[in-house]
Each structure stands twice: as C-alpha cells, then as structure tokens.
C-alpha cells in the first residue's frame, strides 16, 4: 500500500448521513448486542450481497469477538484508517446494517466500500447503496471509489 493518507488531515469526517429511510452513525462498542443480532440473523443474506464474493463473512464469531471487532472499527475511525458506520432505522434506532469505507490496498486515496442490510430489511439495500454512493461523491475527498453496483430485481 502507498503512504498517502486515506483522507487529508484537514478533512472533517462526516459524523452521520440521514435520510427518511435510515441514519448512519459511526459504529462502536455501544452497538455490540444490536449489531450482533442484526448480522447473525442474516448470514446467508449478507453472503449473497454484492461486495461479499468469497462467502466467508460473516463468520461464526461470538458476541465477545464481535465486541473486539467493533472496538477495532472504532479505533480505525478515530485514527482515520477506515470508517465504519452502523445503519439505523430513524424511527426506532434498530440496526439495519453496516457500511465499511476503507482504503484500496493499491492506492490509499481510493476507497473500497461494502455495505449490508439485515435480511428482514432487504428492501433497503438499493436505497442504501444509492444514498451512500451520492454521499461518497459529494462529501468525501476520495480519488475514486469501488462499491459493488446494486441492480434492482
């Protein structure tokens, strides 16, 4: 990986994205139980989501392992190495899914983005992809973005 910073030092990282359908906020340890419930109820659905080609994630980790993973994502966010957002229902604050924004392995000025929604909220996958795609284009300083396209059924 090159030595360029993922985002410029003076860039103010967005703390949220709000739409009528969902709200994004930085993922952290405080989301552990709800995050764990969201992805463990949707493993096959997530594995069939564009951007998860190897079918190995999510794995069978424990809730304690999930907490460590959320801590790592929060640390990455704090140190600007990557940005993971939880996707929340704006009315109930239930976790709908996640969005991961990390540097491309070959060019850290480019972002590789993945997202998922829980199976029970599958209808939000395309609206989430559309909103995040526009947000990345208009509010982030990346030289380019790789984010697997969503096609309506």
Language model segments and positions:
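GNAT-family acyltransferases
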Residues: 1-120, 131, 135-153
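Conserved polymerase palm-domain catalytic core
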Residues: 123
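Mature exported/compartmentalized surface modules and terminal targeting/interaction regions
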Residues: 126-129
């Amino acid at each position: 990986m090159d030595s360029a910073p993922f985002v410029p030092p003076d860039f103010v990282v967005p703390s949220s994205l709000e739409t009528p359908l969902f709200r994004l906020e930085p993922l952290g340890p405080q989301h552990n139980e709800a995050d764990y419930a969201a992805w463990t109820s949707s493993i096959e659905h997530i594995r069939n989501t564009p951007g998860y080609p190897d079918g190995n994630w999510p794995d069978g980790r424990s809730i304690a392992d999930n907490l460590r993973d959320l801590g790592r994502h929060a640390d990455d966010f704090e140190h600007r190495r990557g940005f993971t957002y939880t996707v929340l229902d704006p009315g109930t604050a239930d976790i709908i899914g996640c969005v991961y924004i990390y540097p491309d392995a070959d060019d850290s000025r480019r972002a590789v983005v993945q997202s998922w929604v829980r199976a029970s909220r599958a209808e939000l996958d395309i609206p989430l992809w559309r909103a995040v795609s526009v947000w990345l284009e208009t509010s982030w300083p990346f030289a380019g973005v790789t984010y697997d396209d969503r096609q309506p059924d």
